[in-house]
Every structure is written in C-alpha cells, then in structure tokens.
Amino acid sequence: MGSIRLDEISSIIRKQIEQYNNEVRVGNLGTVLQVGDGIARIHGLDEVMAGELVEFGDGTVGIALNLGSDNVGAVLMGDGLMIQEGSSVRATGKIAQIPVSDAYLGRVVNALAQPIDGKGKISASEFRLIESPAPGIISRRSVYEPLQTGLIAIDSMIPIGRGQRELIIGDRQTGKTAVATDTILNQKSQNVICVYVAIGQRASSVAQVVNTFRERGAMAYTIVVAETADSPATLQYLAPYTGATLAEYFMYKKQHTSIIYDDLSKQAQAYRQMSLLLRRPPGREAYPGDVFYLHSRLLERAAKLSSQLGEGSVTALPIVETQAGDVSAYIPTNAISITDGQIFSSADLFNAGIRPAINVGISVSRVGSAAQIKAMKKVAGKLKLELAQFAELEAFAQFASDLDKATQDQLARGQRLRELLKQSQSAPLTVEEQIATIYTGTNGYLDIFEIAQVRKFLLGLRFYLIKNKPQFGEIIRSTGTFTEEAKALLEEAL
C-alpha cells in the first residue's frame, strides 16, 4: 500500500474549493390551494404584482388579479386541466406583453398574439405591453381627417374622423358587424391598417368574416384577433387589449389604423364572470364596480397623435349589443358616455328592408363636419334636414286622409331619399359616387321615378359618370370641393 501524500490531497481539495460555485436563486414561489372555473387560489407569492404573469407547474400561464393577505387569486389563460391542489406556482416578474411587427398583417391570431390560421410562426423582435397607457392631452390633436366607411348614411350624416371613437349599437341581427366589415373593405385604397377583434363569437361567424376579407383582398392590410365563444373568459377579456396594442404599434409608426371590437358586451360578460368567481362584490346587473374603467381605458387608447409624434391615428369602432332596443342598460350607457358618438342600428328598419338599418334620427357623431371634405358638407346638409322633416311628416300623415300637394311632394321626395340610402352589403361607394347620389336626390332629379326604379337609375348614373365623365371624380378627389365645374359635369350627366 503506497503512502498517502498529504500535500497532493490538500492541493486537490484547494482546487475543488476554488472551482466551487454556489449559485443562489431566489424565486417567488407559491402553492395552489384551490383551482376550478378558470380561477386558482394560491398560497405564497408574497411579492407578486397586480397583473403579473404567474406560471404553473404544467406550463399554464395565469394573471394575478386579487392580492389578499393570505392568498392570491389568479385567472388562467388556458383550461388548466393538469393543475392540481398543491401544484407549485412561480411568479415570472413580467406583466402581460405581446410581440408586435408588420408581419402580423394578413394573419389571424388569438389574444396572446399567437397565430391560429395554420400559416406558421410570425417573426417579431419588438414587444409591447398589453395594458399600455393612453396618449396624454399634449400628445394628441383634434380630429380633422375623414375615415370613409363607403356607406352613404354614415359618411354624409354621421361622419367618422381618423382618431375618433364611434360606437355601433343595436339589437342582435341588425347588421352591426356588416357596417364594421364594410368599413374595413372600404379602406383598400385609403392606406389605413385595420384590426378586427372578434370577442366571444361563433367560430363560423369569424370564419365567414375572414373569408370575405380574403375574397375582397382586404386581408393584405388587416389583422384579425379572435377569441371564440368556447375560449376561456380570461382570453375573451384580454382580446380587445391585444388588438389595441397591435393598432398602437402602427399608430406610433406614423400610420393610420382602424380597430373594430365585435363586441364589447361579450367582453364585459367575460369580465363579470371572472370577477364573480374571484368573489369581487357585484354591482348593477351583477357587473363589478370597475366595469366602466374596463372599457374607458381601452377606448381612450384611440387617438389622433400630434404632429410632433407623426400624426398617426387609431380610430375605434366598438360594437355593443342591446336587448330589445334598450339603450339605457348598464353597458350601453357606459359605452355611449365614453365614445364620441353612436350609430344606432334598428331592428324595425332592418325588418322593413332598409339596409344598412341605421336610424339617422338618433345617431350622432360628436366630431361632426370636422371629419368631412368640403364637397360632402355642401351636399349633405340638405339631406339631413329633408329626412328629418320627412320622418315628422310621415308620422303625421298616417292620421291625415287628405294632404295638400306640397305635403304629398315632400313625402314623395322623402321616400326617394330613404331609397338612395339603401346599400347592398360589401358594396361600399367612393366619395364622388356618394356626392353624385345625394345631389341627385336632394335636387329633385329622382322625383319623376317610381320608388322601385330609384336604385336602378342611380346604378346607371354611377356607371355613366365613371365611363363618360371621369373628370367629375378627379375634381372631387383632387380638390375635395364640389366646384361649379363638377356641378356642371354632373348636371350634364343627369
């Protein structure tokens, strides 16, 4: 047996001590006390922030919303079927954020901005917080450019400007989504990026909208964020904020964007479900006390940026569903008070065959004519007045049997004006076509036609102007005014 050399052993031990690296990791950990209905109650996580992302043992991610003295209430962003009582939870130290890039255009994503259209990954190097603060007063300027929807009733009487928030409100099945999708289709040549957020809708309805966009070439400038009816409430609640974050990315790059939330009633219901399960005290209609803030912080992110920030814009068109035309319910009144005007779609008009079924009498745009070109202002003023007088007369005429000639003429004119506001779905009109149509109606050129012939005549007129009088459209597009020359060209055509 060889002798043990102490100096050798001591040098080996010294080397081992020098190489020893004890890495200390401090983790904010917790244990699941209870899980179910998309909610987990967690013991521990002493230093977690409100809204922080937490990760469960099975990889499911949640958001810490309720911070109690002895436990934390978190909502799950997934089904969480593998989470059990006693499972470990780790605080990530991050607030919910999503990747953003131009590569999102033409894609369908979920509330976490992950693609769900089967077209592979989306490359992005930049991240933005889902809950970003809205631009301040100094960062904004007043709305002054029109956002053309392609619908005569809206562009002439309820004009929408870039950076505005215009609510679309009405009962189910009255064409609210059709107004929104037509607006997206009309942005094809307007250099506006569109974001369509589907919240709690049937998957078949969302697929139909996406197909329409694909067929009409609108997906090239559109992003669809979809969380369908079978998605967890947490993701339905997050989807609008994800859409707003994607739209803001383009706004700060000096581009114009338009975002449609379809619809915010479903988001409020998802938030109510989460809040009740988290045992937050219910308020009116069982909604939590902060449901107003839920929508106000979302819609305040729509803005027209100042010239120092590049004059980008986000125009928000939120949709809210009413029950039997009751606009005095909680969510509709909240949305009306937050937005800069509302477009009412009426079930009575829809059933009477007037499409789009927009009730022009009670719809309003608080930005108003600031968002119209001069040519439209000139012809549209008369239209609104004549339609208002017609609505009044029509109600009166139901009781009167013998009407004088002037009243009969006014009623006949009103019926023809109402006819010219009718439009097929997915058939938006250019500004010059709208101006020609309105001028024709308000100046009595349609009075000689039967009501059934009005739309046929207008179709012929638009076709004739494009083919034989292209200068008419060029004048309006280039100058934005209804000049004497344009008027003469139109009257020649008539």
UniProtKB/Swiss-Prot annotation:
It is a peripheral membrane protein. ATP binds at G170, D171, R172, Q173, T174, G175, K176, T177. It is an enzyme of class 7 (translocase). Keywords: ATP synthesis, ATP-binding, CF(1), Chloroplast, Hydrogen ion transport, Ion transport, Membrane, Nucleotide-binding, Plastid, Thylakoid, Translocase, Transport. It is found in: Plastid, Chloroplast thylakoid membrane. The record marks S363 as: Required for activity. GO terms for cellular component: chloroplast thylakoid membrane; proton-transporting ATP synthase complex. CDD domains: ATP-synt_F1_alpha_C, ATP-synt_F1_alpha_N, F1-ATPase_alpha_CD. It catalyses: ATP + H2O + 4 H(+)(in) = ADP + phosphate + 5 H(+)(out). Disulfide bonds: none annotated. One of its GO terms (molecular function) is proton-transporting ATP synthase activity, rotational mechanism. PROSITE patterns: ATPASE_ALPHA_BETA. Its EC number is 7.1.2.2. Gene3D superfamilies: 2.40.30.20, ATP synthase alpha/beta chain, C-terminal domain, P-loop containing nucleotide triphosphate hydrolases. Pfam families: ATP-synt_ab, ATP-synt_ab_C, ATP-synt_ab_N. F-type ATPases have 2 components, CF(1) - the catalytic core - and CF(0) - the membrane proton channel. CF(1) has five subunits: alpha(3), beta(3), gamma(1), delta(1), epsilon(1). CF(0) has four main subunits: a, b, b' and c. HAMAP family: ATP_synth_alpha_bact (MF_01346). Produces ATP from ADP in the presence of a proton gradient across the membrane. The alpha chain is a regulatory subunit. Belongs to the ATPase alpha/beta chains family. This is ATP synthase subunit alpha, chloroplastic. It comes from Pinus thunbergii. The lineage of its organism: Eukaryota, Viridiplantae, Streptophyta, Embryophyta, Tracheophyta.
